[in-house]
Amino acid sequence: MMLFPLIRKILKIYYLNKIVIPEFIVAYIEDKYWLVGLVITVLALLLFYISIRLMFALPQLLFEKKTVKEAVRYSLEKTKRQSWFYIWNLLWIIVKTYLFFILLLIPILASQVLMDGLTHKESLVLGIINFVLIKNFHYMALTYFLIKFVSFLTGEELEITPRRKKDHWMRWGVMGCACIFFALEGYVYLEAPVSHKPLIISHRGVSDKNGVQNTVQSLEKTAQLSPDFVETDVQETKDGQFVMMHDANIKNLTGVNANPQDLTLDELTKLDISENGYHTKVSSFDAYLNKANELHQKLLIEIKTSRKDSPDMMKRFMEKYGTVLKQNGHQMQSLDYHVIDQVLAYDSQIPVYFILPYNSIFPRTKATGYTMEYSTLDENFVNKLWNTDQKLYVWTINSSESFDKSVHLGADGMITDDLEMIQEQVTIAQEDPEYTELLFKQAMEFFNF
């Protein structure tokens, strides 16, 4: 676990980078099932202990050509009653690596703080130079870690081979090309941190807990903040109508232990719904859509499906609302690809996004784009997306860290629980970027666990 940030950066193993628990799952476990979180923590510690006991097996397999059984036996014997000794040695290597990087980083940031008070041009030039230095120091620190880690596993210091004079120009040539590339990257990163303004989308129709999710009452408040879209959740009712509801079971919001598909629309809209200290009635989709059109507020409508839905649910939905949705510029999304297919079959001009709660493999679909949980999103996914004409929305962006990551990866839209915070972040990034802060954020990528 301690080595993941370093190993992932050195090896760039695709599936190792996938070992990430989505943030929304972590938050849900912490909030609802803390005991499950405790069990996961214990299992992680157990896995870490096992990895310590077996870490000397790999060098035996690769360098000594021993069998798996012999290598495992060797590692277990070597670490017997000495686990803490090796843990502290590993920790010390990691600490030294980070200290090495931090000590080089401090004068860079200090000089940038002083230069940021001068003209924009001077500050930008030094910022690019400092960006190049940070990238070089980053790779120097990784090299230092790799040398120390391999020496630790093998018990031997790496031999220093004498430099050959004919390689001198090649080394400087490679270094020069790398610095030019880093400088170009730094210019783009510092001068245009937001190359195109992302759409800002209200999550479940609320912002900063200003009301009850998915209700007309909250829509009226949230629309005043001028989001580009308001994300909503729609489910079918027992009588084939449509209601505004996110949860599969409505007990948490209404106190009634039932699914939306168990009650008629009339029964649902008579229920009181409470959240964030606010109280109102459950909203029908008709009432919500009419209010949105009245306010000229565009919606991102998520269709939530269940086994209790009627077979022709989407056909009826599109026949009833399709024309209105298209005329008013609304968009759709769903976790169920059958919904995507049926929307496109009805009218391919209606934007519809496929929701991906986890980034595993890149899907090949006809969707307008993808709505991705941000914490597992990576450059590999984005690079493949650039080869298509599809868009990317990310959720849920509620911090400067998640905003920075989304901007860096070029997200087309950000779904957030705090519209004003994200709007402010976009304004600062476009109009008054702080080079010291941007350099610091770039440096902190080295510490990304």
Each language-model region and where it sits:
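Conserved, mostly hydrophobic/aromatic
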Residues: 203, 222, 233, 268, ...
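Amphipathic, non-transmembrane alpha-helical secondary structure
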Residues: 216, 220, 224, 282, ...
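C-terminal active-site rim and adjoining tail of enzyme catalytic domains
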Residues: 354-449
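Membrane-interface segments at or immediately adjacent to transmembrane helices
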Residues: 189-239, 243-244, 251-253, 259-262, ...
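Structural preference for beta-strand elements that scaffold enzyme active sites
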Residues: 197-201, 229-231, 298-300, 329-332, ...
